[in-house]
Amino acid sequence: MAIANNKKAFHDFFIEDRIEAGLVLEGWEVKAIRAARVQLKESYIYWKKDAFYLVGCHITALPTASTHIKPDAVRPRKLLLKQSEINKLIGKTERAGYTIVPLDLHFSRGKIKMEIGLAKGKKQHDKRQSMKEADWKREKQRLIKHTR
C-alpha cells in the first residue's frame, strides 16, 4: 500500500532500475507518515561518505508531537541498503546522466520502506512524446469503452 508517490520523478526521468530501501526514522516521523503527512515531490538522494541520504522529503509533524522534541521536517534521512545494492548504485551513478530518485513510500510487513529508482533524465522532446503516448492510451480506452 503506497503512502506517498513521486509522480514528478516519472515525468522527469526514465526509470531503469528499482530498489527497495529502508529508512532511519524518528518516532514522530513514523506517526506522521502513518497519517500520510509526507511529501516526496522535491526530494532527491545523494551519497555521503558511507551511505545514501534522502534530502528534501518533507514530513509534517502531527500537532500532538512531543513538546521537548523539536521536529525538523526536512532533515536528511539515512537509507538502509545492502552493500551489494550500494556498490551497484555507486557504479551506475558514476556514469554520466544517471541519478537516484525516490519513487514512493510504502509499508512492507509493517515497516516503512522507500522504493528508489536508478534514473536517467528526460529531454523536453522525450517528455512531450510521453505525454502524447499517455493521451493516445487514454483516447484508445475511451473509444473501446464507447464501442461496447
From Swiss-Prot:
UniProt record, GO biological process: trans-translation
The entry's keywords: Cytoplasm, RNA-binding
RNA-binding in keyword set: yes
Biased composition (Basic and acidic residues): 127-142
SUPFAM superfamilies named in the record: Small protein B (SmpB)
Principal location class: cytoplasm
Region named Disordered: 119-148
A Pfam match: SmpB
Gene Ontology molecular-function annotations: RNA binding
UniProt keyword RNA-binding present: yes
Database matches in InterPro entries: SmpB (IPR023620), SsrA-bd_prot (IPR000037), SsrA-bd_prot_CS (IPR020081)
Subcellular location: Cytoplasm
One GO CC annotation: cytosol
Assigned protein family: Belongs to the SmpB family.
PANTHER family (alphabetical): SSRA-BINDING PROTEIN (PTHR30308:SF2), TMRNA-BINDING COMPONENT OF TRANS-TRANSLATION TAGGING COMPLEX (PTHR30308)
Purpose of the protein: Required for rescue of stalled ribosomes mediated by trans-translation. Binds to transfer-messenger RNA (tmRNA), required for stable association of tmRNA with ribosomes. tmRNA and SmpB together mimic tRNA shape, replacing the anticodon stem-loop with SmpB. tmRNA is encoded by the ssrA gene; the 2 termini fold to resemble tRNA(Ala) and it encodes a 'tag peptide', a short internal open reading frame. During trans-translation Ala-aminoacylated tmRNA acts like a tRNA, entering the A-site of stalled ribosomes, displacing the stalled mRNA.
Name recorded for this polypeptide: SsrA-binding protein
Lineage: Bacteria, Pseudomonadati, Pseudomonadota, Betaproteobacteria, Neisseriales
